[in-house]
Amino acid sequence: MARVKRAVNAHKKRRVILERAKGYRGQRSRLYRKAKEQLLHSFVYSYGDRKKKKGDFRRLWIQRINAASRANGLTYNRLIQGLKAAEVEVDRRMLAELAVSDANAFAALVQVAKDSLPADTSAPAVSAEAAPKAKAAKKPAAKKAAAKKPVAEEAAK
């Protein structure tokens, strides 16, 4: 049986791995075994992060919609509730795009949502200019002074 020589294939395989690991730090870009291990981890991260990116964008859209709807006097939750009641089918991606690029159209949608909501007195009112809450002033350290007096009296006795 003829001898199989694999030097060319082995060198090509290693070269491809090291080329793909270019840009990694330290041994991970220079040593084949470390580079191969890092590439396997990188593939796992890239797969997972492609899934994670969808949730990240959804959270970003919700933040943008919430900020714009509060500027128009309605919370995000009430806006979505009102749009569903009005049977307006606009997804969060488009709402966020409208909130950023076309404020007048977004304000019109907020008005549609407000009109379709039932008059609910228990719902919190959101003002267009929400004032930051003032923190309560701390009380002076009267307790510490009162606690020290008996100790001082006992020492005097």
UniProtKB/Swiss-Prot annotation:
Compositional bias segments (type: Basic residues): 135-147
Record keywords, A-Z: Ribonucleoprotein, Ribosomal protein, RNA-binding, rRNA-binding
Gene Ontology molecular function: rRNA binding; structural constituent of ribosome
UniProt entry tagged with the keyword tRNA processing: no
Keyword Ribonucleoprotein: yes
Bias-annotated ranges (Low complexity): 122-134
Cross-referenced InterPro entries: Ribosomal_bL20, RIBOSOMAL_L20_CS, Ribosomal_protein_bL20_C
UniProt GO cellular component terms: ribonucleoprotein complex; ribosome
One Pfam family this sequence matches: Ribosomal_L20
Domain of life the protein comes from: Bacteria
Similarity annotation: Belongs to the bacterial ribosomal protein bL20 family.
Protein name from the UniProt record: Large ribosomal subunit protein bL20
Organism of provenance: Arthrobacter sp. (strain FB24)
Gene name of the encoded protein: rplT
